[in-house]
Amino acid sequence: MTNLFDPRSLGGQAPAGPQSRYILPSFIEHSSYGVKESNPYNKLFEERIIFLGVQVDDASANDVMAQLLVLESLDPDRDITMYINSPGGSFTSLMAIYDTMQYVRADITTVCLGQAASAAAVLLAAGSPGKRLALPNARVLIHQPATGGIQGQVSDLEIQAAEIERMRRLMETTLAKHTGKDAAVIRKDTDRDKILTAAEAKEYGIIDDVLEYRKLSAQK
């Protein structure tokens, strides 16, 4: 399981593991303005869609925040959609994205594809009320901050322990705010990994609805 908070992230970016990646195709678009080369991410951005498909770290957080701010400047009254398929990541990066989501004027629809684990689960819950969604087979994982590997003098350990407790309380109050649950319930539920199906995430208050497949909707 990917931990939400790596103690090493207290001082900076959590280390990134090896990742394999499908090569995105590029394509040519013709318009009245001429010809331009594009790719799926550019096309999504033009439709005011942000896709978070990697771990939450300084690099991905900066990318997401930049897109949020640009889309707000282009049109603050149009919704922004954030698709999420992420194993989670660092606390500071999570809160940077979270604060930016709350800062911009546009409503933000969050949609879970695959998984929203750990930090990504908080971002999923932080979407605008009534606009937090997931596909039927998506899963959501919430848990407490990780504590392993802390070293140093006693005074350093006390400082790090206090910071981990502060982060845990902040995570609990943030989830409580967006789920409607008491922070004490969140603390109990995140004492161990809590894995939720899309339907269970709706019942828990992390999302508002489970999406139907578009094919099925069209057949009705």
From Swiss-Prot:
GO terms for biological process: protein quality control for misfolded or incompletely synthesized proteins. The active site is at S118 (nucleophile), H143. It catalyses: Hydrolysis of proteins to small peptides in the presence of ATP and magnesium. alpha-casein is the usual test substrate. In the absence of ATP, only oligopeptides shorter than five residues are hydrolyzed (such as succinyl-Leu-Tyr-|-NHMec, and Leu-Tyr-Leu-|-Tyr-Trp, in which cleavage of the -Tyr-|-Leu- and -Tyr-|-Trp bonds also occurs). This is ATP-dependent Clp protease proteolytic subunit 1. InterPro entries: ClpP, ClpP/crotonase-like_dom_sf, ClpP/TepA, ClpP_His_AS, ClpP_Ser_AS. One of its GO terms (cellular component) is cytoplasm. Belongs to the peptidase S14 family. It comes from Rhodococcus jostii (strain RHA1). It comes from the Bacteria. It is found in: Cytoplasm. Cleaves peptides in various proteins in a process that requires ATP hydrolysis. Has a chymotrypsin-like activity. Plays a major role in the degradation of misfolded proteins. HAMAP family: ClpP (MF_00444). GO terms for molecular function: ATP-dependent peptidase activity; ATPase binding; serine-type endopeptidase activity. Keywords: Cytoplasm, Hydrolase, Protease, Serine protease. Its EC number is 3.4.21.92.
